[in-house]
Amino acid sequence: MKAAHDAGTGLMLDAEETWIQDPVDELAMEMMKHYNKEKAVVYNTLQMYRTDRLDFLKKSLEQAKSGGFVLALKLVRGAYMEKERRRAVELKYKSPIQPDKAASDRDFDAAVMYCIENIDRISCCVASHNEKSSLLAAEQAAKKGIPASNPHLHFSQLYGMSDNITFNLANAGYNVTKYVPYGPVKDVVPYLMRRAKENTSVKGQSSRELLLLKKEINRRKI
């Protein structure tokens, strides 16, 4: 984290399963207190398919205000839904996961809105392949008069996915990155499969993306 701070770049801590996330949250907050005094360096990741994350976001902002540091967050929908629900059933406790996709979408978009409302104190990365959520963030920022290049607003999509979102946001002047998973094949492939499955869950979006890819291929043939 010191290396990221000294290099002037951001470092995003990934989110894990609920039963091991608390220490990650605590570490992220401690590191933000230390490194985020002047600008966003250390980012925590919030999985908005969890029922408690919207409240956690608001409490985190209060901590940032009282501690005098920038709250930096990456917003995602979530990656471990089946595992979380299965464990809750096996151990007989209430599932920490939203009951359906609509509820996850609702809290994700609410988190995006909240971050933009507090853009002076929160640095937010909207990490989503969902066109509606990405458009919502861009429209709300424009409505608030927030420049596209504001250093507290970022977007990110996986390399090889949702290029139509990435390129249009970049063309409009927003801070956009491509997320590139790196690691052993046995770890990276399951991760990419979960992301692909998540991407296909957005009604109609995958078909639209395929059509756009075919259109671009035909354009390059000419």
What are these regions (language model features)?
Residues 1-222:
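Positively charged, amphipathic and often flexible ligand-engagement surfaces
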